[in-house]
A protein has these predicted regions:
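Amphipathic alpha-helical coiled-coil segments
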Residues: 38-53, 128, 132-151, 162, ...
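Bacterial Sec-pathway N-terminal export signals of envelope proteins
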Residues: 18-64, 72, 217, 221-260, ...
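Periplasmic alpha-helical coiled-coil/stalk elements that build and connect Gram-negative outer-membrane
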Residues: 24, 131-244, 347-350, 354
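Sec-dependent N-terminal signal peptides
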Residues: 3-13
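Membrane-embedded beta-strand positions in outer-membrane beta-barrel channels/transporters
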Residues: 26, 94-96, 140, 242, ...
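Transmembrane beta-barrel architecture of outer-membrane proteins
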Residues: 90-92, 138, 183, 298-300
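Small/polar (Gly/Ser/Thr/Ala-rich) solvent-exposed segments
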Residues: 37, 60-87, 98-127, 253, ...
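Short, charged, amphipathic alpha-helical segments
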Residues: 112-115, 178-189, 320, 387-395
Length: 433
C-alpha cells in the first residue's frame, strides 16, 4: 500500500505545466490558426474600402491614343478610268480629366460608411481572436482532464491486478471464496474497459488540441499550475461583469456598428435624389497625312449637371429597403443587448458554481482516499471487510478523482468564458497578468 501511495505522489508531481508554457500554446494558436489568419486577411481587405471611397473625390485621368492606316487600290471612276492608288494615315492622341463636383453628399457618406466597416472588421477580428483563444484554452484543459482520466484508470487497473493476485493467493489459503475472486476479476475487466475508453477519449482530445493550437499535443500533463499562476483579472462581481460586457463585448459592439452602418446606407440612398455636377477637360491632337489639314489640336471643357427626375421608382424602393434594414438592425441590437446580459449572468453563475463544485470534489477525493486506504488495510489484514466493499471503495475513489479532474477543467474554462463575454480575453491581457 505504501508503494502505491508513493507511486501516486510521484505521478502527481511530474510534468508540471507553468503559465509560461500554457501561454506558448495560446500564442501558437494566435499566430497559426487558419480561421484567425483568414479573419486578419478579411480585415486588410475591408480596410481598403476607405481608399476606394476617397477616390470618389479625386479626379479621373484617361490617356488614349490611336493610329490607323488605310491603303486604297484598284480604284476606278464612273466612266471606268483607273485611278492611282493612295493611302490614308492618321493618328489621334488625347488626355481627358473628369472631376466630380457634387453628388448630394454621397461620397462623404461613403467614406463614413467605409470607416464604420473598418471598425466593424476590427471588432470581428477581435471577436475571432477571443473565440480562438477560448477554443485553445478549452482544448488545452480538456487535454489535461483526459490525460488525468487515463492515468487514474491506469492506476485503477494496477490496483485491481494486485487485488486479483492477492485474492488468488488468499483463495488457496481458504481465506476467501471463489465468489470473492470472481468479483475481483470482474472488477479488473471493468477497469480495463474504462481504461480503453479513456485512451480513446484522449486520442480525440489530442487531435482537437493539434487542430486548434497547431502544435503537437504533449504526451503527459499531470499537474497543471497555469490556472493558478495566471491572473485573469476577472470581474469582482456580477454588476462589474455587466459594466465590462456593456463596454467591451465584441458581439454587442458589432451590433451597434451594424445599426450605424444601416443609418449611413439610408443617407447614401437619399443622396441619389440630389442633383450631381461634374466637369471634364479634354485635350486632343489629331494628325491626318492624307487630308488638306495635316494636324489639329483641340481643347474641350465641359460642365455637366444631372438632376434625377424619374427612374421607374427604383430610388424610392431602394430608400424604403434601406429604411427597413435600419429598423431590422435596431431590433437585432435590442435583442443582442438582452442576449449579452443573459450570457454575462450565465457565465458569472457558471464561474461561481464551478468554483463551489471544485471545492466539493476536492473534499470528496480526500474523504474517498482515507476511506479506501482504511478499507483496503482492513481487508488485507483479514478483518471483516468484504471484497465487494473494497471494490466499492476503489470505484468511489476513481469516480471522485475523475470528478475532481473534470471540476478543475470546468473551473478553468469558466474563467476564460467569463473573460470572453466581458470582452477582455486577449493575448496581450493574458501576458500582462
Amino acid at each position: 500500500m505504501k508503494f502505491i501511495i508513493i507511486f501516486v505522489i510521484i505521478i502527481f508531481n511530474a510534468n508540471t505545466v507553468s503559465a509560461a508554457e500554457f501561454l506558448i500554446y495560446l500564442e501558437s494558436a494566435y499566430k497559426s490558426n487558419p480561421f484567425l489568419n483568414a479573419s486578419r486577411e478579411n480585415y486588410k481587405a475591408i480596410k481598403e474600402n476607405i481608399n476606394i471611397s476617397r477616390s470618389e473625390f479625386l479626379p479621373t485621368v484617361f490617356i488614349t491614343g490611336s493610329q490607323s492606316s488605310q491603303q486604297n487600290s484598284n480604284r476606278t471612276n464612273k466612266v471606268g478610268t483607273t485611278l492611282p492608288d493612295n493611302s490614308n494615315n492618321s493618328e489621334k492622341k488625347s488626355i481627358s480629366v473628369d472631376q466630380k463636383i457634387f453628388q448630394g453628399f454621397q461620397g462623404y457618406n461613403l467614406i463614413k460608411k467605409s470607416k464604420l466597416e473598418t471598425d466593424q472588421a476590427t471588432l470581428e477580428l477581435k471577436n475571432t481572436e477571443q473565440q480562438v483563444l477560448l477554443q485553445s484554452a478549452t482544448a488545452y484543459y480538456d487535454l489535461v482532464y483526459k490525460i488525468k482520466n487515463v492515468q487514474f484508470n491506469l492506476l485503477n487497473v494496477d490496483l485491481f491486478e494486485r487485488q486479483v493476485e492477492s485474492d488468488s493467493s488468499r483463495l488457496q489459503k481458504g481465506e476467501i471464496t471463489l465468489t470473492d475472486l470472481a468479483q475481483s476479476e470482474s472488477s479488473l475487466a471493468g477497469a480495463n474497459a474504462k481504461f480503453i475508453a479513456a485512451k480513446t477519449e484522449l486520442l480525440t482530445a489530442k487531435s482537437n488540441f493539434e487542430r486548434i493550437i497547431r502544435l503537437p499535443a504533449p504526451e503527459k500533463i499531470i499537474k497543471d499550475n497555469s490556472i493558478k499562476t495566471i491572473s485573469l483579472n476577472l470581474p469582482t462581481g456580477l454588476n462589474s461583469a455587466f459594466i465590462f460586457s456593456e463596454k467591451n463585448n465584441p458581439k454587442l459592439l458589432l451590433a451597434k456598428l451594424d445599426y450605424k452602418i444601416s443609418e449611413k446606407n439610408v443617407d447614401i440612398e437619399k443622396s441619389k435624389f440630389s442633383p450631381s455636377a461634374s466637369i471634364n477637360y479634354t485635350q486632343s491632337q489629331n494628325k491626318d497625312f492624307s487630308s488638306s489639314v495635316d494636324e489639329a489640336d483641340q481643347e474641350t471643357l465641359k460642365a455637366t449637371v444631372t438632376i434625377p427626375l424619374f427612374k421607374g421608382g427604383k430610388n424610392y424602393s431602394s430608400l424604403k429597403k434601406k429604411k427597413f434594414r435600419k429598423a431590422q438592425s435596431n431590433l437585432i441590437l435590442q435583442d443582442i443587448i438582452n442576449e449579452v446580459k443573459t450570457d454575462t449572468a450565465n457565465s458569472w453563475s457558471v464561474y461561481k458554481s464551478s468554483s463551489s463544485i471544485l471545492k466539493a470534489t476536492q473534499a470528496q477525493v480526500k474523504a474517498a482516499e482515507i476511506a479506501n486506504e482504511g478499507i483496503t488495510l482492513e481487508y488485507d489484514s483479514g478483518n471483516t471487510r468484504t471484497t465487494l466493499e473494497v471494490i466499492q471503495s476503489r470505484s468511489l475513489l476513481l469516480n471522485a478523482r475523475i470528478s475532481n479532474a473534470k471540476a478543475e477543467r470546468d473551473f478553468a474554462v469558466s474563467k476564460f468564458k467569463l473573460l470572453a463575454v466581458v470582452g477582455k480575453l486577449t493575448l496581450e491581457n493574458l501576458k500582462k497578468s
